[in-house]
């Protein structure tokens, strides 16, 4: 199963972009309480001073609301919002066109900034620090450097892989914000709100069942909600109950912990082929026929958060929780092995 085909893949799809379901203010935004509280202060301070907000870097897994928060920030600052992504900005001229069209205090959002072309990144440094573009016009002996003044703007960037950002780029963000997976209670509120805006009846137990399987990710919660709605409407149910949600998601192969076929293949392969590990990431990628990046960025973060695997210097290792979830008997020394590997990791 490819990552794009997964119902619970956290990457954005066309169906996920529903403006009516998106919160419009920080007060409407559910979850990330600490980040929201700090952003409120920074936004109010910048607005009171009439200055551009310091550059902001959002770090965290896909689907946690980085784009939505950037849009809300622009709205609460009362400025324009421009959006792009790292891979789209192929050359310096593309970035120059974006930056020269910004007005004073505007917000420019760059998603996946870790995938920015290094040559483009060099142009971004003086733009962020001095609000100037340093461009080279011409070639060879006739080449000359031209400085272009820019409006004082705010760059809001998002990355799922902080380690891939260069130190000079990372250090130019005055406001780093780490986003974490959501609790079941927070996702339950998001599911209820979505159901209300859809005009869909929803019991508390139904909302909780969807939230439990949403992998701590609002984007996945919204996608599961839309699929459960389809089952409920065809069944002519007045409201989504726990039974309807459970039947729908079970038929969609999303289990009680939010794991799908690919997650279970990952865990089962380590259990049955490698005795629970340790096993290297390249071996896992080859066994699953999935790119290493997809495994590290998409599959593993949730499994680690749920306590199903450990990353150690010698490779990935299944925990007792994983063996129990798979319904398999772990090796007798699994707990002792995990303790030893943890000590080695430290």
From Swiss-Prot:
Q: Where is this region: Small ATPAse domain (RuvB-S)?
A: 183-253
A Pfam family matched in the record: RuvB_C
Q: Name one GO cellular component term.
A: Holliday junction resolvase complex
E.C. code: 3.6.4.-
Matching InterPro entries: AAA+_ATPase, AAA_lid_4, CbxX/CfxQ, DNA_helicase_Holl-junc_RuvB, P-loop_NTPase, RuvB-like_N, RuvB_C, WH-like_DNA-bd_sf
Which positions bind DNA? 292, 311, 316
So which domain of life are we looking at? Answer: Bacteria
Chief place of localization: cytoplasm
What keywords appear on the UniProt entry?
A: ATP-binding, Cytoplasm, DNA damage, DNA recombination, DNA repair, DNA-binding, Hydrolase, Nucleotide-binding
A Gene Ontology biological process noted in the UniProt record is:
DNA recombination
Protein purpose: The RuvA-RuvB-RuvC complex processes Holliday junction (HJ) DNA during genetic recombination and DNA repair, while the RuvA-RuvB complex plays an important role in the rescue of blocked DNA replication forks via replication fork reversal (RFR). RuvA specifically binds to HJ cruciform DNA, conferring on it an open structure. The RuvB hexamer acts as an ATP-dependent pump, pulling dsDNA into and through the RuvAB complex. RuvB forms 2 homohexamers on either side of HJ DNA bound by 1 or 2 RuvA tetramers; 4 subunits per hexamer contact DNA at a time.
What free text does the record give on domains?
Answer: Has 3 domains, the large (RuvB-L) and small ATPase (RuvB-S) domains and the C-terminal head (RuvB-H) domain. The head domain binds DNA, while the ATPase domains jointly bind ATP, ADP or are empty depending on the state of the subunit in the translocation cycle. During a single DNA translocation step the structure of each domain remains the same, but their relative positions change.
Q: What is this protein called?
A: Holliday junction branch migration complex subunit RuvB
Q: Tell me the organism.
A: Sinorhizobium medicae (strain WSM419) (Ensifer medicae)
Q: Give the lineage.
A: Bacteria, Pseudomonadati, Pseudomonadota, Alphaproteobacteria, Hyphomicrobiales
The gene from which this protein is expressed is ruvB
């Amino acid at each position: 199963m490819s990552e794009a085909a997964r119902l619970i893949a956290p990457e954005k799809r066309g169906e996920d972009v529903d403006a009516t379901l998106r919160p419009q203010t920080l007060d409407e935004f559910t979850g990330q309480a600490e980040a929201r509280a700090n952003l409120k202060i920074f936004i109010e301070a910048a607005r009171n001073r009439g200055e551009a907000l310091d550059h902001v870097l959002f770090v965290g897994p896909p689907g946690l609301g980085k784009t939505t928060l950037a849009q809300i920030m622009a709205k609460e600052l009362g400025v324009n919002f421009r959006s792009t992504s790292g891979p789209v900005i192929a050359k310096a001229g593309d970035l120059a066109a974006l930056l020269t069209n910004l007005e004073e205090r505007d917000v420019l959002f760059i998603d996946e900034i870790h995938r920015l072309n290094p040559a483009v990144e060099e142009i971004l440094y003086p733009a962020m620090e001095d609000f100037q573009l340093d461009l080279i016009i011409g070639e060879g002996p006739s080449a000359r450097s031209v400085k272009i003044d820019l409006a004082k703007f705010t760059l809001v960037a998002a990355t799922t892989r902080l380690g891939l950002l260069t130190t000079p780029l990372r250090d130019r963000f005055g406001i780093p914000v780490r986003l974490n997976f959501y609790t079941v209670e927070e996702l339950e509120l998001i599911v209820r709100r979505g159901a209300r805006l859809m005009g869909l009846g929803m019991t508390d137990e139904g909302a909780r069942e969807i939230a439990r399987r949403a992998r701590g990710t609002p984007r996945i919660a919204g996608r599961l909600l839309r699929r459960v709605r389809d089952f409920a409407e065809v069944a002519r149910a007045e409201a989504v109950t726990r039974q309807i949600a459970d039947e729908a998601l079970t038929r969609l192969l999303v289990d009680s912990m939010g794991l799908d076929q690919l997650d279970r293949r990952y865990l089962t392969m380590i259990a049955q082929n490698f005795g629970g590990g340790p096993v290297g990431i390249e071996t896992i990628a080859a066994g699953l026929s999935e790119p290493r990046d997809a495994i590290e960025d998409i599959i593993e973060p949730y499994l680690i958060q749920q306590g199903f695997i450990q990353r150690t210097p010698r490779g990935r290792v299944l925990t007792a929780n994983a063996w129990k979830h798979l319904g398999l008997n772990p090796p007798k020394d699994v707990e002792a092995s995990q303790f030893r590997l943890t000590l080695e990791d430290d």
